[in-house]
A protein has these predicted regions:
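Conserved beta3 VAIK motif of the Hanks protein kinase fold
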Residues: 128
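Accessory nucleic acid-recognition modules appended to NTPase machines
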Residues: 1-125
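Non-catalytic C-terminal interaction segments of nucleic acid-processing enzymes
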Residues: 179-187
Length: 187
């Protein structure tokens, strides 16, 4: 489980390379493939594959999916300190919350940038960028810059652990804890 949680957030081809290096002592390709199929089939309740969506072409891509744990407790059970990979942990928590609110969730791609989540429910669509802290001006610029190429008028959110309001240019900043405590979904 520790191996899974420490490599979960990388794209699938990289995941396969890491997995292959762990079992490379086995020389029979069929045996490796069978083990991999069995391994992945057993994980379907622990992890969810999230497709990548190209915002400009409005198409779901068939590559570069991301994987998220379905329950944050799985990571905690490995004994990993919460300070290790805090942004990934926060991203996973927001993913679980969006699912619990009934959203279909995809990872956004726009040009060479990534938007952590595109959340869609019926005709409602929202964009989410997750960061641990954005007090630093350069960090804030990097996070907000991702939205520059998104030309539609759907809500764009930046979620962080900061309590100060860093909303700007129509992009709404929220504290992650406040977001998680909202009653009626996104407000």
């Amino acid at each position: 489980l520790h191996f899974l949680t420490s490599t979960l957030y990388i794209q699938f081809p990289k995941f396969l390379n890491v997995l292959y290096s762990k079992i490379s002592k086995i020389t029979n390709f069929r045996a490796i493939f069978s083990m991999l199929v069995l391994f992945i089939s057993r994980l379907t309740h622990l992890i969810k594959k999230v497709p990548r969506y190209d915002i400009l072409s409005k198409k779901t891509l068939k590559v570069d999916e991301k994987y998220y744990l379905t329950d944050h407790g799985f990571r905690q059970a490995t004994g990993c300190p919460i300070t290790q990979d805090i942004e990934r942990i926060l991203e996973n928590i927001v993913y679980i919350e969006l699912l619990s609110r009934g959203y279909e969730v995809k990872v956004g791609k726009i040009k060479d940038k990534e938007i952590n989540f595109i959340a869609k429910k019926e005709k409602d669509l929202s964009y989410y960028q997750i960061s641990y802290k954005i007090r630093d001006e350069k960090t804030r610029e990097r996070i907000y810059e991702t939205y520059n190429s998104v030309t539609d008028n759907f809500p764009k959110y930046v979620l962080s652990m900061d309590h100060s309001n860093f909303s700007q240019d129509g992009i709404i900043h929220k504290n992650i804890i406040d977001f998680l405590l909202e009653d009626e979904g996104v407000k």
